[in-house]
């Protein structure tokens, strides 16, 4: 049986995005492995509540190994009582010129923070370079990820039709654009100049075009985007949207500084 529905969500609002703190240290001690803010935790619960009311619900979640993604996944895992697997293939994007390229915590470490939540029997579909990635590299990573990942899911869980991935803005965008068979994450998805939306806790849905099945190689299957960066269920709507048109890594200190400077300039003009 082929996977027919794929939800892809971004993690919730990070604690280091708050204008005045508090800024708790990374629970794992790993650089940039920050937790969600209280607001982000609330978003994660709103996401879980939204998903639990959908007609087509995910049957399992595959998460980035970074703390904020597991924290975002937790309410949905608990609400739907579905298994959670960690896959480094959907991990964060770090540029090569970054001083430190964070290595995510091991399963043993993360299980201490999320006891009995993370299923141990899943190996990464692909491992991001420990030297960082260019925009072209992360797009290629996601391109290589899909056929390996889907083949393993369909073999290991032959009765599963719907899955969910919880990841980061850049990875979410690159994953989606690869499903839609674009050659770059910077291309609009239609002639109106629309891009995949990547706000905090935003969720996309990709549906397999009818008539496709597991007998067709994954690379030849066609997908359609039926939900683009949906945040209608969030109290504050869309926040912290990011695309590859931004100059900085999503959610990085440089990104936050640039956003605040732009907002300050806007307020002065008003």
Swiss-Prot record:
InterPro entries: His_Pase_superF_clade-1, His_PPase_superfam, Phosphatase_SH3-domain, Tfc7/tau55. To yeast YOR110w. Gene3D superfamilies: Phosphoglycerate mutase-like (3.40.50.1240). One of its GO terms (cellular component) is nucleus. It comes from the Eukaryota. Disulfide bonds: none annotated. This is Uncharacterized protein YNL108C. Present with 1950 molecules/cell in log phase SD medium. One of its GO terms (molecular function) is phosphatase activity.
């Amino acid at each position: 049986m082929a996977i027919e529905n794929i939800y892809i969500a971004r993690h919730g609002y990070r604690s280091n995005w708050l204008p005045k703190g508090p800024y708790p240290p990374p629970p794992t001690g790993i650089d940039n492995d920050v937790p969600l803010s209280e607001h982000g935790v609330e978003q994660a619960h709103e996401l879980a509540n939204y998903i639990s009311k959908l007609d087509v619900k995910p049957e399992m979640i595959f998460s980035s190994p970074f703390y904020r993604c597991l924290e975002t996944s937790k309410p949905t895992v608990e609400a739907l009582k579905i298994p959670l697997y960690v896959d480094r293939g959907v991990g964060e994007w770090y540029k090569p010129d970054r001083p430190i390229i964070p290595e995510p915590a091991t399963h043993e470490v993360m299980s201490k923070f999320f006891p009995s939540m993370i299923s141990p029997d899943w190996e990464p579909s692909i491992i991001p370079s420990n030297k960082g990635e260019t925009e072209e590299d992360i797009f290629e990573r996601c391109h290589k990820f899909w056929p390996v990942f889907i083949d393993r899911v369909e073999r290991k869980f032959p009765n599963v039709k719907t899955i969910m991935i919880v990841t980061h803005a850049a990875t979410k965008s690159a994953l989606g654009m690869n499903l839609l068979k674009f050659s770059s994450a910077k291309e609009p998805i239609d002639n109106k100049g629309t891009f995949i939306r990547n706000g905090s806790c935003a969720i996309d849905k990709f549906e397999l075009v009818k008539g496709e099945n597991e007998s067709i190689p994954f690379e030849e299957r066609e997908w359609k985007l039926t939900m683009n960066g949906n945040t209608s269920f969030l109290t504050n709507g869309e926040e912290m949207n990011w695309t590859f048109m931004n100059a900085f890594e999503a959610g990085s200190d440089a990104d936050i500084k640039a956003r605040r400077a732009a907002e300050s300039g806007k307020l002065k003009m008003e």
